[in-house]
Amino acid sequence: MISAKTLRPAIAAIALFAIGATGAWAQDKITVTSEKPVAAADVPADAVVVGIEKMKYLTPEVTIKAGETVYWVNGEVMPHNVAFKKGIVGEDAFRGEMMTKDQAYAITFNEAGSYDYFCTPHPFMRGKVIVE
């Protein structure tokens, strides 16, 4: 049987790894315009969509033109969001609101660049938007 004394350091190590992993997603500059979550049914038919299911972004990398909008659509009961970091420790971090099942979140990318993102409560969920 595993004792609490043995388990606590392991949990602490996992937590520190997760925190460190999110710091690796530092951004030099992000210029986005966001909306609050909307019903997935309201996402335009011709939109660039990243689905979320089974604890992952289904299209982990998308390429768009500056000024275009990406919609993240949550298809599962587990709440998710989209977050970007501007600094290693999270200064000026952008974190979208949590989406529940059948909700979508839209972000407009106004400047060219490569934008790595992750889900705040699930930092192993990662993706990238490349803006040309």
Curated annotation (Swiss-Prot):
Domain Plastocyanin-like, residue spans: 27-132
Pathway(s) it belongs to: One-carbon metabolism; methylamine degradation
What broad class describes the main subcellular location of this protein? periplasm
Q: For binding Cu cation, which residues are annotated in this chain's numbering?
A: H80, C119, H122, M125
The protein's matches in Gene3D superfamilies, at most eight in alphabetical order, are given as: Cupredoxins - blue copper proteins
Query: Which keywords annotate this record?
Result: Copper, Electron transport, Metal-binding, Periplasm, Pyrrolidone carboxylic acid, Signal, Transport
| PTM sites of type Pyrrolidone carboxylic acid | Q27
Record's GO cellular component terms? periplasmic space
Transport among keywords: yes
Could you tell me which InterPro entries the record lists for this protein? Amicyanin (IPR035668), Amicyanin/Pseudoazurin (IPR002386), Amicyanin_Para/Methyl (IPR013475), BlueCu_1 (IPR000923), BlueCu_1_BS (IPR028871), Copper_blue_Plastocyanin (IPR001235), Cupredoxin (IPR008972), ET_Amicyanin (IPR052721)
**Signal peptide per UniProt:** 1-26
Q: Which GO terms describe its molecular function?
A: copper ion binding; electron transfer activity
Q: How is the cofactor bound?
A: Binds 1 copper ion per subunit.
Would the keyword Plastid be found if you checked this record's keyword annotation?
Answer: no
Question: Which Pfam families does the entry mention?
Answer: Copper-bind
Cofactor annotation: Cu cation
As for subcellular location, the record says:
Periplasm
PANTHER family from the UniProt entry: BLL1555 PROTEIN
Summary of the function given for this chain in its UniProt record: Primary acceptor of electrons from methylamine dehydrogenase. Passes those electrons on either a soluble cytochrome c or to pseudoazurin.
What is the official name of this protein in its record? Amicyanin
